C-alpha cells in the first residue's frame, strides 16, 4: 500500500476512537501516536504479488493453527497503541485469537514495496516491527523488479538481511516454507 501524509484536517484520536472510526471507513489507515495515515491503492503488480503470497501461505498452512491476513488485518505494534496495515501477515500465536480487529504477535510480516513507501518500509516500519519478540521474518517484496529482501531474526536475536532474485529459492523459517522466487513474479511486466 502507499502511505500518505497524515489525513488533514483531523483531530488526534485515541487508539479506541481510531479502531471505531476505522471500521466505518472505505479506505485503510495506519495509526501512529494519534495521527492517522491514509493508505492508498497499489499497482497491479502490487496486488498480484500480495495475492500470490497470501495464497501460497494459505495452501501451506491449511488445517493448522496459524492465521493469514491481508492488508485488512491490522497489526498492533507490541507495547504500543500504534497500528499498521501490512500487505500480508501470519500469526500462530494463540493470544491473537482474542481480538477481532487486529493481531499483535505475527511471526511473519510482508510488505510489497512501492516507490513511495520503500524507504519507510525498510527503515521506520521495520524498527516498529523489530522489537516484537514473536516476529521471525520480515519480507520486503519489490513490485518493480524481481527482488525480495528477507529480514530474518536468528536464534541470537540478531536480524540478518538476505537478498533473493530470479531463480533463487527463499526459505521462511517462521512458517517452515521454501519456494521459488519466480513463482511470485511469473508473468508480471516491469
Curated annotation (Swiss-Prot):
One Pfam family linked to the record: Uma2
SUPFAM superfamilies on file: Restriction endonuclease-like (SSF52980)
UniProt family annotation: To Synechocystis PCC 6803 sll1609 and slr1290.
UniProt protein name: Uncharacterized protein slr1290
Organism: Synechocystis sp. (strain ATCC 27184 / PCC 6803 / Kazusa)
Lineage, opening ranks: Bacteria, Bacillati, Cyanobacteriota, Cyanophyceae, Synechococcales
